[in-house]
Structure formats: structure tokens, C-alpha cells
Amino acid sequence: GTLPEPPKARVAVDHSTADVDALVEQRFLQLASPASTFNGPVPAACDQIQYYQFRLRSAPEPDAVLVLMPGVYSGANVFSYLAKELIYAAHTRTDAAPLNLEVLAVDRRDNCIEDLTGLNAAEQARDTQVALDYYFNGVPLDGQLFDGFKSSDDVPYLSEMGLAQVMEDVHAVLTTHVPDPLQRQQKAFIGGHSMGASLAWVYAGWDFDGDETTLADAGYQNVAGVIRLDSRYTPADSQEAAPLPATENDAVI
């Protein structure tokens, strides 16, 4: 059909991927956190919280820390481009004082059962057939064979990796990197993309000690604000109110 408007002029690029990579680093980190065995034993990999840390290579004290959760079909690495560009832009801006940002992107615990061997090898080789052969044709990679796709009966322990696990994992990452509660209130932000943005709102209202008479442990008491990407919400004080319009990059602080 007809385009709704004429194409816009191409925006001049003022930096390259190499510029960003020279300034910003991405690190894969883990926190030991034994998973529940209530519904059966779990693989050793599931006893770790997995996440990525994005920060300036010089590793200065951050002015702000963003803890982000991915959408329903994504993992923590989905934030790689956004996090790096955001950190670079904040540090190199000329219209105001540079900011030192840090981004922590947290995987949901059930990502621990993923076998990314074929996908990683295909990406490195720039050949999708490598992944197809590994996952569907029984071709090993570095001596490793794909163990097959799992059914629910194979992974009963996933029943314990629900909403509470997500909240506890994100809180553990946040408090590990920003241990001072006052610092968290001043410079830590919780957020996410799509479903991850919804989970950010859940975090803000989560009661971490299970005692409704205490408030210091509540999620909203441990962050300076909430950031949402590709999401919308309805104000809690009105069931009749229409959701606020969502934008492609929308933040609520």
C-alpha cells in the first residue's frame, strides 16, 4: 500500500561500533543461588543467577545503575546494543556533564536449561546451517552432542522458577552491586522491555520479607525509579482509566 509519509532523511552517524566497544565493556557474570529442589533435583547451572554487566571499561563509580529484565521470548543479551549505546551516549554527551552509567541485564532462572552451543557457533561462523545441523541433524560441535528438546516431564523443577524466583534474583543482583540502601534509592533504577517492563512494576510492589507491616524491604524503597520499554500501564487508583499511551522508548521516573 501507500506509505503514510515520505521517507525521512538519513541521520548522520557520529560514532561507530568500534568507538562504543573501545569505551564500553560487556561482562557475563553469575551469582551463586541454589534453586529450589521441592519438585526434583536441578542441573548445577540452575544454581546460578546469570546476568550481563555493561559499564565503562575504566570502571568508575556509576552515577546511575539500571537493572533491566528482558521480554517473554528474550534473554539478558537482548539489551547488548541498547545498553552499550546508552552508556556511550551518556558518557560522551556535550550538552551536559558526562554521566557514568552501568546496566545490569538479568536472565530469568529458567534460561539455565538452554543449550546455546549451536546458536553461538552459527553466529560465529555466520552460517545458520551450523545451528540446524547441531539441533536437528545430530552433528556434534567440539565433541558435544545436543541432548534433545525437553518436555515438561523432563524438567519438573521449572515449576519453582516462577515470579517469586524472578523477583528474588533481580533483587539479589541489585543489592550485590549497590549494597547501600540509600544509594539504591538515589541512583538505582529497575526496568525492562515488554514483559520485563511489567515485571519491573511487580518488583516495585514486591514485599521481600513477607511482612506487610514493614516497608524498608519493599521494591519501591530500593530504587529511585522505574523504566519501561515497549509497554503500557493503568494507574492503580482507577480501574476505569484508559492506559497511558505507550511509546517505543518510554520511561517513568
Locate each region found by the language model:
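Glycine-rich His-Gly loop
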Residues: 68-72, 193-194, 231
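Alpha/beta-hydrolase fold nucleophile elbow
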Residues: 181-194
